[in-house]
C-alpha cells in the first residue's frame, strides 16, 4: 500500500530496498553469509524482487545479507532461476518502462497506479491495496505472504506494530520444495478483458480468479487493447540498441502506446532531443498502425524492425524507417 499511497499523493518515483535493508536476523550468526541459503529469506527475497521488478526503480539494497544472484545457488536451481527470470524480465521491459517514465515526466502520469485510478466505476477495486497497474497495461498482484515457509514477521496491530519476537522465527533447518505449486486469489477489474501475462489465457473482468503459481511466478495480467514493446536481453540498459523490438498486442479492444526514445544518458531531452512513435491497434479491423516518428536526437535509429505478436502467437515483422506503416492480421 505504501507505494500506491505515494503515487496517489503525486510522488511517483517510489521504491523499496529489495530484501530489506537490515536482514541480519536471517543469518545463523552475525555476518556469516548464511541467509542467502535460508529458505525463509530465499522466499522473502524472491517475492520481494518480483514486486520490485514492477516498481519505478528496481533496487536490491541492504546490509548483513549478500544479494548477488550467485549467493542464492546456481543456474538450474529454483531460487537462482526465479531471480534470473525477474532480472531478465525487467531488462526486456525497458522500452515499456522508459516510455512510461516519459508519460510520468511529461504527461503527469504514474508508474504504480491504484486500481481505482483506471477502473473508478468498479467499486470492488476501491479498497484493493495489494494489486495495482504498472503503467496503464499490466496488472500486478504480488505475492506478499509466505507460501513455502512460515511467516517470519507478524504484524500484531496498527498500534503495537511488528512482533518483537519475530527474530526467533527467521531461521529453519526444514527442507523446502520450491518446485511445489501453490495458488493465490486475484480480482480482475470489470469493464475489460484480461490476459495472463505468462500463459495468454483470457479472463473476463469483474471476477475473482485463482492463479496457480510456483516460486518463479508473480501473477501478472494484461489489459485488452494493450501494446507492450519488448526489448532484447541485455546485461545493462544500453548494451544493445533497440533496433529490433517486439510489439506484444493484446486484442479485444482498441489501444494505443507511444514509444519514447532519447540519448538515454543526459538531459538533452529537456531541450527537445527525443522521439515519439505513436502505435495504435484497431480491434475491429485487426490492424496495427505504427505512426510517423516525431522529433529527433543525435544518434537515433533511422531504421529498425518491429515484430508484432498477438496474444494468440500470430506474428508479423515489418521494417520501419520513420514513416507510418500498418500491419493487418
Put a short name on every predicted segment:
Residues 215-324:
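Accessory, solvent-exposed terminal regions and/or long lumenal/extracellular loops of proteins
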Residues 1-216, 222-223:
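Catalytic-domain carbohydrate-binding cleft regions of carbohydrate-active enzymes
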Residues 179-181, 206-207, 320-329:
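Solvent-exposed, conformationally flexible loop/turn segments
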